[in-house]
């Protein structure tokens, strides 16, 4: 007998359950399952492999085995336990037959088996015919195919083999459903093969390998009858059996035929879904392959539409073709043919054969329509890979497959192929898509690569040869190993920080370790299966476990998404820190130059060009390996983005048809750029460029004009240069048809020199593309250099020349060389180059005196043409010099202050680069060069003359250190000279002296008032100091330190021994000096400034009356005293305790300094929001500060504690830029999508409620006839811009009801589909508050109504279509809208016009002019907010009459009729209102805040105590730049948006006492420092502690004949950034607070009086509008009043002086106030500061004062 041949173990592959085996019985060519069973589902593979691993029983192990029944697995492999039957039910050959049936003529050796006890066992009946095999045992059961090469034993050995060998044969499962018949047939065929009946199975041509015997046919019939009950057979099988009940062979033949057909279709679908193309194969072959697949599928009934096909193709594009995925997917009607046109075009560009396939070239219009951009700013996408594939690459270089340098994937819209709204379908099995099923977008397997990582797990990767991890927390024995080279799947280098050990502690208490590499530049933590295999650990994906070879289970495997993962809990943590890991390459010899530094050094060229140039040695001094390229792929230079912004790139190869090949320097392109306006006369206004066609060498020459002689001089120079330097003669010069080229003078010159002029033809810009693109490139570089360096614009040509020098030295990927190499010149030595605008110090060899400084600050421009020196710009001398005597000025801060390049400080790199060039400061330099007098060869820049009429930004004069500057400060500043960060000025003023010519980081002028007269006991003193002097660095540091102390209580207090003058050091933007100024009262300041400006600040005489009220106008009908008392009587002003007489201290004694920082936003202002403070000033001292806010910041800081992670790239956020960038608060989404509310909602009860709401909404839509149900439209027939996307949104209302709404995606609606002039109006909050206040005073009934589905009552005029709701199942159809669906741009306006028309025509209402959505008639007032209506009426029947009329047309629900005389509770537009008619009204939001604030994840009551105030005075927001990584920054900004969004909503509803804090913190949403977050937490904490507070209104006295409308105003001078003031106003109607406003002044005020005028002028327009509204709603007379605590402001308003004001802006405001007072019956009165409740709107107050000003109107 032939010996058994057992296969060896194959390597364990990713996803395989065990080793694959091969027996001699398996046929390689004739097996009919080659096209079917070989692609069965994974469960079938697993069961087959598990079956092949079973061992023989001990009784039969010693018996020779039958070669046809060979067990291919060694006995050491345990049998699987996860089959459909228990282990004891596994059948031998005898067990596979019914009881009593003899096998091969031998009696059954097992009369009873557990299998026969199965409930699915079909016992044989008496009529059953069991096969009795012939007695000739030599007849084999199956005949091998000729190709198999198998031989069989003779008859004598066959009998012994059959009786001695028992092979376990797994029976097929029972058929339980007709739909499962295809899968069951496959298992049944496997059963026949394992039973040695493979030869009788029909092949692909429908014929078996051998003839079936009668016994075998009987066996076939009986087993088929047992395992396939007739009730579960499909119809076509029953049809066959009805003709011949024994024709099992025909059933098998038909089944195999269907398998073959399905397999081909499935293979095509899988191939189509996994297309990959990167240009490595011809585009024709790729197109043929794709079109053949699509044609086959279409012919077989599987329709692939154009959009799906294009999406599948685009998903597989990579390399240069990848951009098509982000540009072409937006074209809805794109075809496959159009997509392949783009692919062919790119392929031709790659191959350089632009004329090979002209039929694929697109015209220019196609290019424009495509909006194609070659600039790929997105980051590489992570490739979705089947984790079960094995990487067979044997490259010596370690490869980490599927590793990306970023977690961000390209973002696409809803139609993109990278997203899907349905569950992904894996197209890895042929039965995933059945015959006739259409392949739609939802069928394609999409993966969101930004969300596919399983946190806390390692990804198992069979393709990675090394293990990589991002966190250093688990790395043991870390060490530097720079020799390791790791690349990802795209062959990009991955920088490795360190190598170490990864130690595992598995669940069986065993420990092991493998090598691991540390890098933060990967998307996942990768665990290599190859390295696990090296330590005897394999992955079994059948059991989903990690196990040893002996079967010991170590850890479970989790399948998440497309990948398999292992938990990190089995990793042992190490004690190594992140800085330790990341500092392993800190040695000077191994540290590489950062790419951003090289990028700036080489004129901001792109990374591929720089890298190629270094590789080809066109740039010398260092190699490609000396540069850190890790950030080159994702690096975005802000200066390049600004300076080189463009639409799209040019068309490559567009000029080939216009010229032939020429030798170097024979064919030149030239063009002129200019003019550049607003430049000094000495600076050039034009430049002319020349480019050689062959070498691409460039020349640029400056021009002051475009005269003929100027152009001729340049042509003469360039021709002579080429002839003498390159021994070449120019033959052709290509140029445009400008007059400077077509003039007779130049034409004769060219003709004389034998040069052919080549002019462009009309409308043929492509022919002149070389010169024009060069000019554009140089101008891009110029803008970028000027932007980066900050140099003035008149140095623009120096930037052009610097760019030309660098670009001549960079290699072209096309020509493989640089222009200098083509010209035969040496490469550029980068060590001789400085970044453009690099600050340097130039030696002055001939100073004015011996004690004069020898160094002159300057800025490096470019290497000199005429010497070995460098062209340097000296601002103090206003000229450029050519010198070698300079030293690089170093600074620890980035010079690029406009953009923060992740802390780009290149001083050390620059020192290493220029180490071989010693400066004049070196001690070994004994001779001084006198070449400072050598003027630059650029005469146009030697002596800069500025136009006197040109406007300039004049810098503030530097103050001498002797002016009240402490000596220590000056000394410290002097020591920092070498580290000063000097930046060039944008413009140079000819009047600026040398002492102040150097630029500052921020160019802002400080408001100054000179010659301020100060009155003292000794007489008049004149001070020539700025009003706001800059603070010294030392004082700034002390102030910062003081503001950050743990005790936030202000420690400064006044004593009787201190004077009323304070030296206030105030930080000035960019300033380095400080001054001390006396603190002067408002009245004194205004009184002294009046000598220069007679009318702006005139102070009135002191009024020492008890009320301190100055009436401005006295009406004839009311006495002055009565009007004053009438206005103030009902106001909720605080009751002040009696004060003792004030003892004024000696004016010459100094008050303690108030530490402040002028440039910072603060919650405490400057000296409590005043630059000048005296005892008799309106600003209070801080001695009554009883601040109790002592919440430890440590409590807040524990919120965002992060685990040890590798450092990420930091993002610097500048305070002022962040504050200026805040336009509005981003709304936070509070609704749920369909998948969140229903599909994936795990809360069953809530899900059912949402489903109910969903059906209710659909029924309402149908009831309202929202769309046309008579006709459905094909999507291809409708203009895409008229198709509106739609979606369902769900939310839970405050009353607990669940609501669904079908809305349109108006945010992406095309502008042509709506009228932008239409307005969607809602009632203003002030109108609602006014109506509520009048309702209380007049005993009105308040009725609240709701109109269901209000928008759907409004018809839509435009032709718009939407996709049907999901439940209709018509994805390819469209329906036309008839009603205004929620979400459309025009829906709100349509509804407003509809309801407005109905209320006016049917209800007899009229809209109040100027107040939209406020309607009235003689009895009823209506406030309308979309579908909510609030009705106010003296007679409840009048309200009921309106309701009856509304119900005739609309589905109107009465929320609250308001008929009770007891307290009634309302919920009106978010306000929780308690109203008892004729008594009081309380407005609050307690229930809403109780629900919402805990959801903000803010730690509430960390100390178990309540806060008494929302903020505290004396605390300033630090202006230091914020360094934070990108993810954390976005997270904190999002958190700030949520917190400030809620606070703003509450503040503007009724908590007007919080508006100052809300407004200040809202300006810092984009600056989420720890300090800002702490202050925001305190604000939310205070809101939580006072959530039960209410705005209290009481009914006005019935005897009052008039309505009194009052605005109380206040301003805090200069307490905001850039000296802006905070202004605030509170509005009261009949003593009830109805609104408030706190904001930063739009203009910069120079005095407290100007700030107060600004505040009052801001309140007057709203005051007049409210007055008109009140008169329309209530016919009582109205008295308007303005209250302010500024006497000087009242004096200005009262004055009739017509002289000019000092400031025309505030003069205009003051004159307007005069007109308002004189013409609109407006009364202006003085109010004491301690009673001014508007004070809470402009500054933080001590707790005692805060409570005193607010407790009467909100409590």
Curated annotation (Swiss-Prot):
Mg(2+) 1 binds at residues 671, 736. Residues 153-165, 402-418, 960-969 have a biased composition (Low complexity). Initially, virus-like particles (VLPs) are composed of the structural unprocessed proteins Gag and Gag-Pol, and also contain the host initiator methionine tRNA (tRNA(i)-Met) which serves as a primer for minus-strand DNA synthesis, and a dimer of genomic Ty RNA. Processing of the polyproteins occurs within the particle and proceeds by an ordered pathway, called maturation. First, the protease (PR) is released by autocatalytic cleavage of the Gag-Pol polyprotein yielding capsid protein p45 and a Pol-p154 precursor protein. Residues 1-23, 48-60, 127-152, 1005-1015, 1054-1082, 1101-1111 have a biased composition (Polar residues). PROSITE patterns: ASP_PROTEASE, INTEGRASE. It is found in: Cytoplasm; Nucleus. This is Transposon Ty1-LR2 Gag-Pol polyprotein. The gene is TY1B-LR2.
């Amino acid at each position: 007998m032939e010996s058994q041949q057992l296969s060896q173990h194959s390597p364990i592959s990713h996803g395989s359950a065990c080793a694959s085996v091969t027996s001699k019985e398996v046929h390689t060519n004739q097996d009919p399952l080659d096209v079917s069973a070989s692609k069965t589902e994974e469960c079938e593979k697993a069961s087959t492999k598990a079956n092949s691993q079973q061992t023989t029983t001990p009784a039969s192990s010693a018996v020779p085995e039958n070669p046809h029944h060979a067990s291919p697995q060694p006995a050491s492999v345990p049998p699987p336990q996860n089959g459909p039957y228990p282990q004891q039910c596994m059948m031998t050959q005898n067990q596979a037959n019914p009881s009593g049936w003899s096998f091969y003529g031998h009696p059954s050796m097992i009369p009873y088996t557990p299998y026969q006890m199965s409930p699915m066992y079909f016992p044989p009946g008496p009529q059953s015919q069991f096969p009795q095999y012939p007695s000739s045992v030599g007849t084999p059961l199956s005949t091998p195919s000729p190709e198999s090469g198998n031989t069989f034993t003779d008859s004598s050995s066959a009998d012994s083999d059959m009786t001695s060998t028992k092979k376990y044969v797994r029976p097929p499962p029972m058929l339980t459903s007709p739909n499962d018949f295809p899968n069951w047939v496959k298992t049944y065929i496997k059963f026949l093969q394992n039973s040695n009946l493979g030869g009788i199975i029909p092949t692909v041509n429908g014929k078996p390998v051998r003839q079936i015997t009668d016994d075998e046919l009987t066996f076939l019939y009986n087993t088929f009858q047992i395992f396939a009950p007739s009730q579960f057979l499909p119809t076509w099988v029953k049809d066959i059996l009805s003709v011949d009940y024994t024709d099992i062979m025909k059933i098998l033949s038909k089944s195999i035929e269907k398998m073959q057909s399905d397999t081909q279709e499935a293979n095509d679908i899988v191939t189509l879904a996994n297309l990959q193309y990167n240009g490595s194969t011809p585009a024709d072959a790729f197109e043929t392959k794709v079109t053949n697949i699509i044609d086959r599928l279409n012919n077989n009934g599987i329709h692939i539409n154009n959009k799906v096909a294009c999406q599948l193709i685009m998903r597989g594009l990579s390399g240069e073709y990848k951009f098509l995925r982000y540009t072409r997917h937006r074209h809805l009607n794109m075809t496959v043919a159009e997509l392949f046109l783009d692919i062919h075009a790119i392929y031709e560009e790659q191959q350089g054969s632009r004329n090979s396939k002209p039929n694929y070239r697109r015209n220019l219009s196609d290019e424009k329509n495509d909006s194609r951009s070659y600039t790929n700013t997105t980051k590489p996408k992570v490739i979705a890979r089947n984790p079960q594939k094995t990487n067979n690459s044997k490259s010596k270089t370690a490869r980490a497959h599927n590793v990306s340098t970023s977690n961000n994937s390209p973002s696409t819209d809803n139609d993109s192929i990278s997203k899907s709204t349905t569950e992904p379908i894996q197209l890895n099995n042929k039965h995933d898509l059945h015959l006739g099923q259409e392949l739609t977008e939802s069928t394609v397997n999409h993966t969101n690569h930004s969300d596919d990582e399983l946190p806390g797990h390692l990804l198992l990767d069979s393709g990675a040869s090394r293990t990589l991890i991002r966190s250093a927390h688990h790395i043991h024995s870390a060490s530097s190993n720079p020799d390791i080279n790791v690349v990802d799947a795209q062959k990009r280098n991955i920088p490795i920080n360190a190598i170490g050990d990864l130690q595992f502690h598995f669940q069986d208490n065993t420990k092991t370790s493998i090598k691991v590499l540390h890098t933060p530049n990967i998307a996942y933590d990768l665990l290599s299966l190859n390295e696990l295999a090296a330590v005897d650990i394999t992955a079994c994906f059948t059991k989903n476990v990690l196990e040893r070879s002996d079967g010991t289970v170590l850890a479970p495997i989790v399948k998440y998404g497309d990948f398999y993962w292992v938990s990190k809990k089995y990793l042992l943590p190490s004690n190594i820190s992140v800085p330790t890991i990341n500092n392993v390459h800190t040695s000077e010899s191994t540290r590489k130059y950062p790419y951003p530094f090289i990028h700036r050094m080489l004129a901001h060229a792109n990374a591929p060009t720089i890298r190629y140039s270094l590789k080809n040695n066109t740039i010398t001094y260092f190699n490609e390996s000396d540069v850190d390229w890790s950030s080159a792929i994702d690096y975005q230079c802000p200066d390049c983005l600004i300076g080189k912004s463009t639409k799209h790139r040019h068309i490559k190869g567009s000029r080939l048809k216009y010229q032939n090949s020429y030798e170097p320097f024979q064919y030149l392109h030239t063009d002129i750029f200019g003019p550049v306006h607003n430049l000094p006369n000495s600076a050039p206004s034009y430049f002319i460029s020349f480019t050689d066609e062959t070498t691409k060498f460039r020349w640029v020459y400056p021009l002051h004009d475009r005269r003929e002689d100027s152009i001729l001089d340049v042509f003469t120079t360039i021709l002579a240069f080429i002839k003498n330097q390159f021994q070449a003669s120019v033959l052709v010069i290509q140029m445009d048809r400008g007059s400077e080229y077509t003039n007779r003078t130049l034409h004769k010159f060219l003709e004389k020199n034998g040069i052919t002029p080549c002019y462009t033809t009309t409308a043929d810009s492509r022919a002149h593309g070389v010169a024009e693109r060069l000019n554009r490139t140089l101008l891009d570089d110029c803008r970028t250099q000027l932007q980066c360096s900050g140099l003035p614009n008149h140095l623009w040509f120096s930037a052009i020349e610097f760019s030309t020098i660098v670009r001549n030295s960079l290699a072209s990927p096309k020509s493989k060389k640089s222009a200098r190499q083509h010209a035969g010149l040496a490469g550029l030595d980068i060590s001789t180059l400085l970044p453009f605008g690099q600050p340097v110090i130039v030696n002055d060899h001939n100073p004015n005196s011996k004690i004069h400084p020898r160094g002159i600050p300057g800025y490096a421009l470019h290497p000199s043409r005429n010497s070995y020196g460098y062209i340097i710009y000296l601002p103090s001398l206003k000229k450029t010099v050519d010198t070698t005597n300079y030293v690089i000025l170093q600074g620890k801060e980035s010079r690029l202050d406009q953009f923060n390049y992740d802390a780009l400080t290149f001083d050390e790199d620059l020192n290493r680069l220029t180490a071989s060039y010693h400066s004049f400061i070196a001690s070994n330099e004994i001779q001084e060069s006198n070449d400072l007098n050598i003027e630059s060869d650029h005469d146009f820049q030697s002596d800069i003359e500025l136009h006197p009429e040109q406007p300039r930004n004049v810098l503030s004069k530097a103050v001498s250190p002797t002016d009240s500057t402490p000596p220590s400060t000056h000394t410290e500043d002097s020591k920092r000279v070498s580290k000063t960060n000097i930046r060039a000025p944008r413009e140079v003023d000819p009047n600026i002296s040398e002492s102040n010519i150097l630029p500052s980081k921020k160019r802002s002028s400080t408001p100054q008032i000179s010659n301020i007269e100060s009155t003292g006991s000794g007489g008049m003193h004149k001070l020539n100091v700025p009003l706001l002097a800059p603070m010294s660095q030392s004082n700034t540091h002390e102030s910062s330190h003081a503001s950050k102390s743990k005790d936030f209580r202000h420690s400064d207090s006044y004593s009787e021994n201190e004077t009323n003058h304070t030296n206030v050091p105030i930080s000035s933007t960019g300033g380095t000096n400080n001054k001390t100024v006396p603190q002067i009262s408002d009245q004194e300041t205004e009184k002294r400034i009046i000598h220069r400006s007679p009318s702006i600040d005139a102070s009135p005489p002191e009024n020492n009356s008890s009320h301190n009220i100055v009436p401005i106008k006295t009406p004839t009908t009311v006495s002055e005293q009565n009007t004053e008392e009438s206005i103030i009587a009902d106001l909720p002003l605080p009751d002040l305790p009696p004060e003792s007489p004030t003892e004024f201290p000696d004016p010459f004694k100094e008050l303690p300094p108030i530490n402040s920082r002028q440039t910072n936003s603060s919650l405490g202002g400057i000296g409590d929001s005043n630059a000048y403070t005296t005892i008799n000033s309106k600003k209070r001292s801080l001695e009554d500060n009883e601040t109790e806010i002592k919440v430890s910041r440590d409590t807040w800081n524990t919120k965002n504690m992060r685990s040890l992670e590798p450092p990420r790239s930091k993002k610097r956020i500048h305070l002022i830029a962040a504050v200026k960038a805040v336009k509005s608060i981003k709304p936070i989404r509070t609704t749920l999508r369909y998948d969140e509310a229903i599909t994936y909602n795990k809360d069953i009860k809530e899900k059912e409620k949402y489903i109910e709401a969903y059906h209710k909404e659909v029924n309402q839509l149908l009831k309202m006839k929202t769309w046309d149900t008579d006709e459905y439209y094909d999507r291809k027939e409708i203009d895409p811009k008229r198709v509106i996307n739609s979606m369902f949104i769900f939310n839970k209302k405050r009353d607990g009801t669940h609501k669904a709404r079908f809305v349109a995606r108006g945010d992406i609606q095309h502008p042509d589909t709506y009228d932008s002039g239409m307005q969607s109006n809602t009632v203003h909050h002030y109108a609602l508050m006014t109506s509520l206040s009048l309702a209380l005073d007049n005993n009105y009934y308040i009725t609240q109504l709701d109109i269901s589905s209000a928008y759907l009552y409004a018809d839509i005029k435009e032709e718009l279509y939407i996709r049907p709701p999901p439940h209709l199942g018509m994805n390819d159809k469209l329906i036309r809208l008839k009603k205004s669906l929620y979400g459309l741009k025009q829906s709100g306006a349509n509804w407003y016009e509809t309801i407005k028309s109905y209320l006016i025509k049917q209800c007899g209402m009229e809209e109040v002019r100027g107040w939209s959505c406020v309607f009235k008639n003689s009895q009823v007032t209506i406030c309308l907010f979309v579908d909510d209506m609030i009705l106010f009426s003296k007679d409840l029947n009048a309200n009921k009459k309106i309701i009856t009329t509304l119900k005739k047309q609309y589905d109107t629900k009465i929320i609250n009729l308001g008929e009770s005389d007891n307290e009634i509770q309302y919920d009106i537009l978010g306000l929780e209102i308690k109203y008892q008619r004729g008594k009081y009204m309380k407005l609050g939001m307690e229930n809403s805040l109780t629900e919402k604030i805990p959801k903000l994840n803010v730690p509430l009551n960390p100390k178990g105590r309540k806060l008494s105030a929302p903020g505290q005075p004396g605390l300033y927001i630090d202006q230091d730049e914020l360094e934070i990584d990108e993810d954390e920054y976005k997270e904190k900004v999002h958190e700030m948006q949520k917190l400030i969004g809620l606070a703003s909503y509450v503040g503007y509803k009724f908590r007007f006492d919080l508006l100052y804090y809300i407004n200040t913190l809202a300006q810092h949403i984009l600056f989420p420092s720890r300090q800002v977050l702490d202050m925001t937490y305190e604000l939310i904490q205070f809101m939580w502690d006072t959530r039960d507070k209410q705005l209290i209104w009481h009914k006005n006295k019935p005897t009052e004949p008039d309505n009194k409308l009052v605005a109380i105003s206040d301003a805090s001078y200069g307490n905001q950034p850039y000296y802006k003031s905070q202004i605030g106003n509170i509005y009261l109607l009949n003593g009830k607070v109805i609104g408030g406003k706190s904001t930063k002044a739009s203009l910069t005020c120079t005095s407290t009086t100007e700030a107060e005028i600004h505040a009052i002028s801001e309140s007057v327009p709203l005051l007049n509008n409210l007055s008109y509204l009140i008169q329309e709603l209530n016919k009582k007379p109205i008295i308007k009043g303005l209250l302010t605590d500024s006497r000087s402001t009242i004096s200005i308003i009262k004055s009739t002086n017509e002289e000019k004001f000092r400031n025309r802006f505030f003069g205009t405001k003051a004159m307007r106030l005069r007109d308002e007072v004189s013409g609109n019956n407006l009364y202006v009165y003085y109010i004491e500061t301690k009673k001014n409740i508007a004070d809470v709107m402009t500054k933080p107050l001590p707790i005692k004062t805060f409570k005193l000003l607010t407790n009467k109107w909100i409590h």
